[in-house]
Amino acid sequence: MFTINAEVRKEQGKGASRRLRAANKFPAIIYGGAEAPIAIELDHDQVMNMQAKAEFYSEVLTIVVDGKEVKVKAQAVQRHAFKPKLTHIDFVRA
């Protein structure tokens, strides 16, 4: 079972995303179900180590946002073209 700590994003857009990536974080989103989508920011190194395992893509993950646990599955993962970096992940509620 994977547990990821996340924060709700305060800013959105290209500039805000670039600032996140410069701070070793990256943007993500949680959507699906009856609730509204949540734009979040994740720690790059924590998620990079988790996604190296194949189970990250097949198991239900737990994301802790503001103390509330959300069960999700990784839907789409975007990577940098030539650097070993994640640029964005879409999570769908499980």
Swiss-Prot record:
Keyword Ribonucleoprotein among UniProt keywords: yes
Family per similarity comment: Belongs to the bacterial ribosomal protein bL25 family.
Gene Ontology annotations for the cellular component aspect, listed alphabetically: cytosolic large ribosomal subunit
Subunit structure of this chain's protein: Part of the 50S ribosomal subunit; part of the 5S rRNA/L5/L18/L25 subcomplex. Contacts the 5S rRNA. Binds to the 5S rRNA independently of L5 and L18.
Keywords, sorted A to Z: Ribonucleoprotein, Ribosomal protein, RNA-binding, rRNA-binding
Pfam families: Ribosomal_L25p
InterPro entries referenced in this protein's UniProt entry, alphabetically: Rbsml_bL25/Gln-tRNA_synth_N, Ribosomal_bL25/Gln-tRNA_synth, Ribosomal_bL25_short, Ribosomal_L25_dom, Ribosomal_uL5_bac-type
GO biological process assignments: translation
Entry's Gene Ontology molecular function annotations: 5S rRNA binding; structural constituent of ribosome
Record's protein name: Large ribosomal subunit protein bL25
Alphabetized PANTHER family for the sequence: RIBOSOMAL PROTEIN L25/GLN-TRNA SYNTHETASE, ANTI-CODON-BINDING DOMAIN-CONTAINING PROTEIN (PTHR33284), RIBOSOMAL PROTEIN L25_GLN-TRNA SYNTHETASE, ANTI-CODON-BINDING DOMAIN-CONTAINING PROTEIN (PTHR33284:SF1)
Protein function: This is one of the proteins that binds to the 5S RNA in the ribosome where it forms part of the central protuberance.
Gene3D superfamilies: Ribosomal Protein L25, Chain P
